[in-house]
């Protein structure tokens, strides 16, 4: 009998919805809730600042969480792991602290058209302030990319290549390892948005060739408000801080400061130790389930849903008809029905999906669309969730007055 992973997630004991919006945020297992509550209940003090036992305990929990993240993504050292609020903050940190100090007029920054706004707007800012040129990797209508075209775009003028590992709209996995190798040949650094990859597959930043790798805790069953940035130690060492204030310094005078050692010079102010504890618990939970199990379950759910959605008249799915190209994400349109109406009608059926531009307006414009609906599955979803989703979708146009 297949284990019902929903029983690990308390929210499903309190609501009977088919939650299929996991690309926006995942639900949290009991062990994550326990880790956050335990920190506040038993260990709450300001980490890194006190010498009394509670503060030392809080510091230990925080730094142990950093070690957990370092092991999870294959960094060389915990010094290469900076805690942030989320992927957005991580990418902005790289843009401000690395981009603005290493990019100049005449240089090029290369991003893909598939990027979430969080991996586009920071690079627009860098190019605007430095006079560099922003260039784009395009994708085909099915979301695929041409490695030869990418290689031709990376030149001696290219200083930064930024690319998502998995698209939050298409669900497609991109060849960031190959692109990183091309970037490094030309002396550019590789920035990887891992927000949508870390929940679904093992990540090893060294094998990927990532110079920077950003991810969010809440996408991988951890708390909101905690995320991570991996950066190669030699790059982080030379970068100025992103924020200034308490705890990111060794000493301060009237006229200047000596910054703290890595990674603390990038973690100004009181840190989110409870969030870090919850993130570590989420990682341990994912490891206990195992990525083999996660990938198989998500593939089976996606295959079931995709085949049935493709058979519904007037429904159009973005990307390919192969479930392995979707990583749990099925983005679609329905003839004559606005995505917001799709989402509202499905919500009335107890099916929770996302509607809108998914913070990827340039990609949707490239595909000739303004908005879409998106269902995104996690390993804890069930065939019953798929049934409810497809049944709601199948009757949607009729309920809107279009007939069958």
Question: How should these model regions be labeled?
Answer:
Residues 1-404:
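Pyridoxal 5′-phosphate
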């Amino acid at each position: 009998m297949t284990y019902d992973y929903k029983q690990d997630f308390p929210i499903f004991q309190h609501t009977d919805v088919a939650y299929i919006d996991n690309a926006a945020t995942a639900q949290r297992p009991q062990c994550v809730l326990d880790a956050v509550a335990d920190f506040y209940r038993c260990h709450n003090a300001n980490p890194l600042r006190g010498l009394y036992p509670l503060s030392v305990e809080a510091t230990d929990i925080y730094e142990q969480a950093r070690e957990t993240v370092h092991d999870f993504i294959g960094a060389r050292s915990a010094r290469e792991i900076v805690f942030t609020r989320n992927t957005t903050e991580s990418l902005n940190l790289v843009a401000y602290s690395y981009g603005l100090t290493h990019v100049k007029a005449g240089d090029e920054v290369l991003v893909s058209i598939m990027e979430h706004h969080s991996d586009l707007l920071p690079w627009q800012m860098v190019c605007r302030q430095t006079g560099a040129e922003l260039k784009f990797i395009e994708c085909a209508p099915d979301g695929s990319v041409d490695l030869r075209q990418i290689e031709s775009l990376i030149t001696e003028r290219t200083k930064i290549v930024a690319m998502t590992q998995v698209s939050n709209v298409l669900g497609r996995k991109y060849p960031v390892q190959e692109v990183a190798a091309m970037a490094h040949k030309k002396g550019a650094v590789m920035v990887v948005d891992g927000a949508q990859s870390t929940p679904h597959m093992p990540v090893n930043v060294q094998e990927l060739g990532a110079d920077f790798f950003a991810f969010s805790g809440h996408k991988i069953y951890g708390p909101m408000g905690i995320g991570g940035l991996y950066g190669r130690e030699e790059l982080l060492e030379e970068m100025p801080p992103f924020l200034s204030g308490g705890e990111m310094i060794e000493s301060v005078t009237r006229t200047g400061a000596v910054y703290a050692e890595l990674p603390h010079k990038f973690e100004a102010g009181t840190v989110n130790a409870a969030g870090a504890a919850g993130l570590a618990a989420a990682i341990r939970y994912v490891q206990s389930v195992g990525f083999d199990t996660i990938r198989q379950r998500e593939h089976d759910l996606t295959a079931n849903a995709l085949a049935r959605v493709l058979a519904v008249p007037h429904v159009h799915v973005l990307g390919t008809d192969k479930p392995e190209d979707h990583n749990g994400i099925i983005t679609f349109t329905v003839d004559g029905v606005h995505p917001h109406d799709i989402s509202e009608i499905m919500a009335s059926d107890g099916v929770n999906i996302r509607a809108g531009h998914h913070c990827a307006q340039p990609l949707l414009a490239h595909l000739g669309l303004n908005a879409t609906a998106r269902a995104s599955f996690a390993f804890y979803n069930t065939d019953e969730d798929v049934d409810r989703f497809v049944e709601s979708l199948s009757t949607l146009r009729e309920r809107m007055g279009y007939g069958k």
